Amino acid sequence: QIFEEYYINTDRVSFEKEDDYQIQLSEVQATTLENIKEKFQQFDVNLLHGVTASGKTEVYIKLIEEFLQQDKQVLFLLPEIALTTQLVQRLSAYFGNQIAVFHSKYNSNERVEVYNHVLQNSEKAKVVLGVRSALFLPFSNLGLIVVDEEHEATYKQQDPAPRYHARDAAIVLAKFHNAKVLLGSA
């Protein structure tokens, strides 16, 4: 026999971690992070308000890191698919293959793959980055939901049904999982 048959299960989407990618928080960012963690002791939902390019993403990354150390899943919601590309690059540089992306530009097979990773609480879906529809993934160990740009009107689903506001639905989902919600706004 000349050939042997092997079945290798590979993911269609994979992200690589950059070894030397480090985030150094400024004094203001570090204070903000500590304030958020303090407020999470009292409140399950908190608002982080900062102007565009003020460094909110770095604060999100450090907060996400703390929830991952507790072996929790994190959902990072964005208002538009177009914003995922830039954020995926930043998050995957830091978290590597723990990132999964879920939105309608992915084909059905890719979405089913992400769905299964989330369902199995796989290492490949510890941080799920997505738009409104990512709320409906089968999380089993959700610890944090970050709703970036929570003021955006695109979080409202008008057509087709069901009609919902993703920010409000995220808060309800977090309640079911006893998770925390961080709303980011500019």
Question: What is the meaning of each model-derived region?
Answer:
Residues 73-85, 104, 184:
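Short beta-strand-centered segment that lines the nucleotide-binding/catalytic pocket of NTP-utilizing
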Residues 134-182:
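SF2 helicase catalytic motif II
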Residues 28, 32, 44-47, 56-60, ...:
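Helical mechanochemical/support elements of P-loop NTPase systems and associated helical scaffolds
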Residues 80-81, 130-133, 149, 184-186:
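A short beta-strand-to-loop transition that corresponds to the Sensor-1 phosphate-sensing loop
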Residues 90-98, 102-128, 136-142:
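Conserved motor-coupling elements within RecA-like helicase/translocase cores
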Residues 1-78:
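Pre-Walker A segment
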